[in-house]
Amino acid sequence: MPTGTIILIVSIVIILIIAYVACLIVRKRNDNLLVALEERKEELFNLPVNEEVETVKALHLIGQSQVSFREWNQKWVDLSLNSFADIENHIFEAEGYNNAFRFVSAKNAIDSIDSQIDLIEEDIASIRQGLMELKEQEEKNSGRVKHALNLFDSLQEAVRENPDSYGETLSELEKQLKNIEVEFSEFVMLNSSGDPIEASEILDKTEEHMIALNQIMDRIPSLIERVTKDFPEQLEDLESGYRKLVEQNYLFTEANIESQFQNIRVSIRENTALIVSFDLDAAEAENEGIQAKIDHLYKVFNREIEANKEAVKISKNLPKFLEHVVQNTQLLDEESQRLNATYLLADSKLSRINQLKARLESIEIVVTESVEDIENPQVAYSILEERLDHSLASLKEIEEEQLVLADYLKSQELSENTARKKATLYINKLHTLKRYMEKRNLPGIPAEFLTNFFRTSDHVEALIAELDYKRINIEVVNRMLENATYDMNQLEELAYLIVQNATLTEQLLQYSNRYRSFDESVQKAFNRSLSIFEKDFDYQAAFEEISFALETVEPGVTERFVRSYEKTREAIRY
């Protein structure tokens, strides 16, 4: 057999083998796909749809919910009886095509089965979702109805067990509860007749009515209690208290008390009507207004009661205090007249004493009338208390001013005595200072000292002359005494300084002898200092001249002499 023929035969055999192997591979793949599709079908078929259908069926749905359930149930029946059977047949056909190596037909059949299963999967998902929604909606509706019924029962129970808490609103509340009961009946009828949408709307409206009524019923008892109990009790208490106060001769700053009682009664009746009409916000606001009116009257009465107590308390001591202040003013007046003969008293002080007398006369009238009015008042006690308080404050103010005026009058004689004693003392001091300076054996008295001495002497003599007037002006005397005292102190300090400078100059001049023989600057300073000392009598300049020269040759010498002098300085003995 030719080689070419052998090669051809071998090639054909190889191709056939390859083709056969390829066919086996394709068939195996298709088998796997068909197995997977079969498994998907079984998974879908085994889903608990039947159980879910039975669960929803057991709810005994009505109306539109029942129609929806029937549609989902029928769809599931169609799927379970027809669609799954069709898929089973198609899988069987595809297996036949695959076993017969009709791969194109098998591929088309497999794709078709896959699409069918996808559609069934979607349908089952929608069926289950629909069933779940029906179940949830039914549970929700059932819960809503149960909650609404419970709320309705609680409202009825509240009205039944506490009718007094709702007062005149009871009939209106019962009417509203009857309307809600009718709405419930309408809801049940519509729901049973298969109109759940309209029934749901009725239930929504019923719930809104019950919630609103519940809120109203929560607020009514406190409002009713105030208009039927609290306010009437407070008003009765006010009227009773008012009658007692009037019997005790109380008067009031407000003349329309009884008309205010009547206005409060009218407000209570009007507010009751607001509560009955369920205008509760307005009723609460009106309640606050009524309470404010009642509180105002309590405040008025309490104010008069407290004012009476305070007025009685003040009246016990005020007349005595007034008498005390009047006596003090009389004493001030008498003392001012006595002193005015000897002293020139300030017109402002005398005028103020007269003003206090006039002011006390008016206060005395007010106090007398007010104290008498306490037993048989002609005005409200609050007015009496205000008058007495004002009078008491005025008397305290006057008393403080009296103390100031008394100190002023007392100071006249004290100031005169002080001035006379100091004038005598200053005369003696001048003589002593004069003798003190003369005993120093100074070459001469500095002009500054003489000027201060004669000025001080003139001031003291002027002070003595002022004290010799028939009527002394103490203000002028005090100013002159102040000037004389200042001059006297200055003169004394100047005397000490002059004597100190003169003494130290003499000591330093003597001490300079140890340097004059060999130090020309010390000799010159000695000559200048001695000349100033003996001719100019400027002891300060003489001291500075010699001390400067000695400090040059012996630092610290001046300070040593000064310290020594201060320890042994002779004091002026007056």
From Swiss-Prot:
It is a single-pass membrane protein. The chain crosses the membrane at residues 8-26. Residues 27-574 are cytoplasmic. Residues 1-7 are extracellular. One of its GO terms (cellular component) is septin ring. Its main location: membrane. GO terms for biological process: division septum assembly; septin ring assembly. Residues 105-189 form a coiled coil. The keyword Transmembrane applies. Belongs to the EzrA family. This is Septation ring formation regulator EzrA. The lineage of its organism: Bacteria, Bacillati, Bacillota, Bacilli, Lactobacillales.
